[in-house]
A protein has these predicted regions:
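Primarily EF-hand calcium-binding motifs
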Residues: 1-13, 21-41, 62-90, 127-143, ...
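Core solenoid repeat modules with strong leucine/isoleucine-rich periodicity
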Residues: 76, 89-96, 104-111, 115-152
Length: 181
């Protein structure tokens, strides 16, 4: 086990944290590569693993690792959907500063609030579960993807084929999975 001495912590704090405001501190802690100008989806994983392990509102998930993974991916997707204005699956410091709802405030609230469902921005398990159930309902072949035929069933077949085709083609927000071009 690694040990952090007082001297190491003081050096780190004075160099990496003290000169910066809380949003830049968050950015500097979350990004995986200290030379990177961006936070990428995987950079959130260690923090979400700790949240899943220690948050009292998520204790019930300890016995279901498959739902822990789905919950974490959904939280990350919700963060990027609302914050990543370029749809690049990368968040700059500027994106973080402009985020509305505030990603930093949501993480602060997750640290303070015991009822995870009261954290409506990104972390609510109830919100995740509604999304998951809708996805499960549409993904009838259980391949983990929603194709055009699956999407046509949404809302009792409320979407036209032309609308669904435009969505599948990436009109509006691009349909990209992190790590792909």
């Amino acid at each position: 086990d690694a040990v952090v001495t007082e001297e190491m912590f003081t050096w780190f704090w004075e160099k990496e944290m003290a000169p910066f405001d809380r949003i830049e501190r968050f950015f500097r802690l979350i990004r995986g590569d200290s030379t990177s100008s961006y936070i990428e989806p995987a950079d959130f994983n260690p923090y979400l693993q700790e949240l899943l392990k220690y948050h009292p509102g998520l204790e019930f998930l300890h016995t279901t690792p498959e739902f822990q993974e789905k919950y974490a991916k959904t939280v990350i997707a919700r963060i990027f959907y609302s914050t990543d204005r370029m749809f690049s699956w990368r968040l700059s410091l500027r994106d973080l500063r402009r985020s509305s709802p505030s990603v930093v405030d949501a993480f602060d609230l997750a640290d303070e609030e015991e009822d995870i469902n009261l954290i409506f921005d990104f972390f609510s398990y109830e919100h995740f579960y509604v999304l998951y159930c809708k996805f499960w309902e549409l993904d009838t072949d259980r391949d983990g993807f929603i194709d055009a035929d699956d999407l046509l069933r949404y809302g009792g077949h409320a979407l036209t084929r032309m609308t669904v085709e435009r969505v599948i083609q990436g009109h509006g927000r691009p349909l990209r999975v992190p790590g792909t071009k």
